[in-house]
Amino acid sequence: MAGIEVQILEKKEDSIKFVLKGVHVSFANALRRTILGEVPTFAVDEVEFYENDSALFDEIIAHRLAMIPLTTPVDRFELDALELDDYTVTLSLEAEGPGIVYSGDLKSDDPDVKPVNPNIPIVKLAEGQRLVFNAYAKLGRGKDHAKWQPGFVYYKYYTIVHISKSIPEWKELKKLAKKRGLPVEETEEEVLVTTIKPFYIPKDFEEYEGKEIWEEIVPNTYIFTVETNGELPVEEIVSIALKILMRKADRFISELQKLTS
């Protein structure tokens, strides 16, 4: 992966935005698809009900349980491996109404695998209603079901908006770009705005678009935004995805060499 550059633009607890330089669009899309479909997390896969007097069918409750994000310990599992660890965690519940059953009421037999948010409502129980079940969580991948997706990811082309100083009110656009927190450079003839965030041209300037105002796409450079559901730290999601990509490439090269030898 020589020649690749990464510049972090913004880092929050649940998201990261970075510039990826020196790669073809096919690699950028492969990274996006790997994050969504290949990075494994824990999620409820099966539920065994013993009692359910609630207003919801077993299937509906099971679906709600499956979509609750569960913490996934990075240090205990080889998440970048191409074969997943066959490990099951049991989350049990025994509740009686009246009241609302929340994700925090689930009791896990593994303290490292538990609901990310304890305040997700599952079902409301009326007086005398009971809900008893065991939910079994295992590692899986988003390509098999969305419940295993670690988060959300998208990318856009890295572009530079050129604004000619022949426009009478060009300073207004420069001021607007700075207000948006966008990098602004200036030459004798034009203003250059790097769109690390959206930059919308006001209607008053639409007549200049395409000539005095035009957008340059910087080759092989993309702005990624990755958000986590909470199962994994956001930087780990990107790191694991890159390792999986490299492992897949190594396996492909190995199989190709077998065919040509």
UniProtKB/Swiss-Prot annotation:
Compartments, record wording: Cytoplasm
Presence of the UniProt keyword Cytoplasm in the record: yes
Pfam families named among the record's database cross-references: RNA_pol_A_bac (PF01000), RNA_pol_L (PF01193)
Record-linked SMART domains: RPOLD
GO biological processes: DNA-templated transcription
Gene3D superfamilies, per the entry: 3.30.70.3110, DNA-directed RNA polymerase, insert domain, RNA polymerase, RBP11-like subunit
Paired cysteines (S-S): none
UniProt GO molecular function: DNA binding; DNA-directed RNA polymerase activity; protein dimerization activity
Principal subcellular localisation of the protein: cytoplasm
Reactions catalysed according to its record: RNA(n) + a ribonucleoside 5'-triphosphate = RNA(n+1) + diphosphate
InterPro entries: DNA-dir_RNA_pol_30-40kDasu_CS, DNA-dir_RNA_pol_insert, DNA-dir_RNA_pol_RpoA/D/Rpb3, RBP11-like, RNAP_Rpo3/Rpb3/RPAC1, RNApol_insert_sf, Rpo3/RPB3_RNA_Pol_subunit
EC number: 2.7.7.6
Keywords linked to the UniProt accession: Cytoplasm, DNA-directed RNA polymerase, Nucleotidyltransferase, Transcription, Transferase
Role, per record: DNA-dependent RNA polymerase (RNAP) catalyzes the transcription of DNA into RNA using the four ribonucleoside triphosphates as substrates.
Family of this protein: Belongs to the archaeal Rpo3/eukaryotic RPB3 RNA polymerase subunit family.
Quaternary state and interactors: Part of the RNA polymerase complex.
Protein name stated in the entry: DNA-directed RNA polymerase subunit Rpo3
Organism: Pyrococcus furiosus (strain ATCC 43587 / DSM 3638 / JCM 8422 / Vc1)
The organism's taxonomic lineage, starting at the top: Archaea, Methanobacteriati, Methanobacteriota, Thermococci, Thermococcales
